[in-house]
Amino acid sequence: GGNVVGDAKIYDPSSLVSSQNVIVVTIQYRMGPFGWFRHPALVDNNSSLEDRSGNFGTLDTISALKWIKANIKSFGGDPDNVTIFGESAGGHNVTALFASPLASGLFHKAIVQSGVSSVSSIEASENYLPSNKSAPTDSGLEILNKILVSRGIAEDVEAAKTIQMKMSKSEKKDFLYSATSEELVTALLNDRPEQVGMTRVFPDGHVILEGGFAEAYSKNTINKVPIIFGTNKDENKFFNSANPNFVEWAPAKGLFRTAGIDQMPVKIIDPDYYDAINFYGSGFWKNSAVDTPARILVENGHEQTFAYRFDWDELREVNGVDLSRLVGAAHALEILFVMGTFDNFIIKSFLFGRGSFRPALELSSNIQSYWAEFAYTGNPGKGTNNALPLWKKWSNEGEKYLILDSTLDQGIKMSDEEYTVEFLLDKLSNDSRLSDIEKCETLFGISYDDGSGVSENVFNNFLGGICKDLDYAKTIEIINAVRTRLTIEDQEET
């Protein structure tokens, strides 16, 4: 997750492969400080543009596509019909390939599932942290500082900074090259900057344009291939459910204990507030990752643009906890339906509410059919069986995206409701579930990192300007609470 942990063996695509007669290749690429890292000492006049970029993970994915182009025919595949797809950080990486001139001709369709559309800050990556310890991107200089401290060369990061500033460029380069994998990962994950987002690509001007994905969309310099963008209705519940400020947790019992889980959710502390902040967090994510890029691409003539929203949330109640409200159509849940991996004790025990299993299987089959038809033809249409509701292209004037849900709820249908910033701000300003201060805190939290929120100017003028002078220390503490928990999980996986 987050371009920090994971490997190519996580997914089991056997159901997708067998049901749709496709070949699925899962690729391995460098992550964390090995995949995306910059330090001024690592480049010189002899460095290639690729080495200067810091986008080593992205270059790995490009190399993988070159290998596929050269070799997939030996596995029964077609090198002239390659579809790339990925979720979350993987969706971000698919977007990077879609926007990178170096990936031209290596793939022919793209599916971005819950991607992140913002990019890393080169300035932050190549400078020391400011005094408030806040930065949108991990700093290569600070990682070197933390290794100096961990080796006992410096007493603390301030002393390390003094030492590093006295080191020659070659000494810094040799020191970084001497660092072990464990040292680099530990330095990255320990005491990360406030406001840091997911590990993302650098807009270096070679692998990725200097203006990032937004420039590629607006200038229409993307790779001219059909694309699907999508998010899940309750993306943020995946993260908010782990936050003790929103959900009360206790030692596991019953099914949770049987599944080997130490802690279990007991109750949502304020359900209406929980639902409200999820709607806006997930809504602004949809705006930045789906609706805005789709609208801009279509405006610039990229007609083969499709979009979806995954809405399935018919989960069960476990030990008195309503998972359909706690988790809902959360981040990453659609992967289960794309891959069709339902034959698992934990999945069967935890996910499905009364009567929801067979409709969920049907939805999974339909999603696989759409994904495969898109891979075959560049248009998901009515699926490979030509029997599903028509998935139309994104239209700036009419219907825009396909809602993916089971027959127990909405089913599969097109929607014309676009999530613009104006639409979301209007909803937020009139939401009776939140006080004005809570509305300000919600918008601040959404805009704090990863580029899904609003500009400083828009924030300062929201609700007549009452938000700009409030104290958001508690909001930042709440954000950091879930970030700390997820970072600990990343360290354990690593």
Label each PLM-derived region with a short phrase:
Residues 109, 117, 121-127, 158-361, ...:
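Substrate-gating cap/lid region and adjacent catalytic-acid/histidine neighborhood
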Residues 59-66, 92, 134, 138-142, ...:
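A structural signal for well-ordered alpha-helical segments within the folded catalytic domains
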Residues 1-58, 79, 347-367, 378-384, ...:
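Non-catalytic accessory segments of hydrolases
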